[in-house]
Amino acid sequence: NELTAETIQTLAARFPGFYLFKDTSGNDHVARSSLDLHGIFLVRGAEGDYHRWLTNAGGPYNGFLLSSSNVFAEQLTAIRSMLDEGQARAAAALSEQMERVIEKCFKLVKGFPAGNAFANAIKILDHIMAFGEECLHRDPPLLYSGVRLPVEFIEYAAGLLRQEELFPARGYIS
């Protein structure tokens, strides 16, 4: 289900406590509408083209609310800063690096029988960002079903991060 821009406008006018709207549709109808949304903070919840969607790049969103934000917080912050500094090409290049990693990780886990592909891909990437070089010496993420994601997934994703020069020198936990 997707709320219309008109519905969001009506809700924003009626309820002053309604201050944030997250669009996960990927269609971006609300953000692209020309309606007065009464100052609602718009965040995008769909992956991809990170450098194109923020207001400082001419896009309609104030920020992101993504699962990958936990993995790529530093990079998303850098994209925003690059855009603020007029470095659109550098922001686009970093965005593309992240997109390639995320897309390949989604494909990697697609047929895994436990969990869902989106959550599994993010768990793998977060595991690597948490432990850095130690990621292969730690147990892989444990899913709610009690199944661990395969270490081969961690190895593959670590290779992707290295290839894109996004592998952390030090994990945020280690």
Question: What do these predicted regions represent?
Answer:
Residues 59-60, 69-174:
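C-terminal alpha-helical cap/extension of soluble enzyme domains
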